[in-house]
């Protein structure tokens, strides 16, 4: 099997606007996002750390780095999934997020799982 397929974690994001925690009059927009990981490779791998790049509608960037996700460093065997929900706040009604997750395979190989850029948007703003 090709090495690139051996170490492969898919990461998919589903964002959601949280109206009851937001305050548009004070430029506070809160979003939740659920990330679902699936080990589509052939070796077990553990999520070690995360790196998020959050950009608001005025091109202001926040970077967030840390160990694990929501206090966990899950080990995913081939075919297993792990899902978590977290949140962020931006100052505009529309923004974007993209992330990468440092993984360590059972054999010690380090690699990244990447979440492609996704949009944070309040309802009925984007068509």
Model-derived segments and their meaning:
Residues 43-62, 103:
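Short acidic, flexible loop segments centered on an aromatic residue
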Residues 56-59, 71-81, 120-127:
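Short, surface-exposed linear segments at secondary-structure transitions and domain or protein termini
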Residues 62-94:
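Intrinsically disordered, low-complexity Pro/Gly/Ser/Thr-rich segments with frequent PxxP/GP/PP motifs
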Residues 1-28:
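Low-complexity, acidic Ser/Thr/Pro/Gly-rich terminal tails and inter-domain linkers that flank the onset
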Residues 37-41:
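Asparagine-centered strand-capping/turn motif at beta-strand->loop junctions
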Residues 28-34, 98:
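Short, solvent-exposed loop/turn segments enriched in Ser/Thr/Gly
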Residues 2-4, 89-127:
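Terminal connector regions
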Residues 8, 42, 59, 108-110:
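Detector for glycine-centered tight turns/loop "hinges" at secondary-structure junctions
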């Amino acid at each position: 099997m090709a090495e690139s397929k051996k170490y492969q974690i898919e990461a998919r994001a589903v964002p959601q606007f949280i109206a009851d925690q937001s305050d548009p009059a004070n430029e506070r927009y809160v979003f939740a996002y659920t990330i679902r990981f699936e080990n589509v490779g052939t070796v077990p791998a553990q999520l070690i750390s995360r790196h998020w790049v959050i950009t608001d509608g005025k091109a202001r960037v926040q970077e967030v780095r840390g160990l694990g996700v929501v206090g966990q460093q899950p080990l995913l065997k081939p075919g297993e999934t792990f899902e978590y929900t977290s949140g962020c706040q931006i100052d505009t009604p529309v923004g974007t997020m993209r992330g990468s997750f440092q993984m360590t395979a059972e054999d010690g190989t380090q690699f990244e799982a990447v979440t492609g850029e996704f949009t944070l948007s309040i309802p009925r703003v984007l068509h």
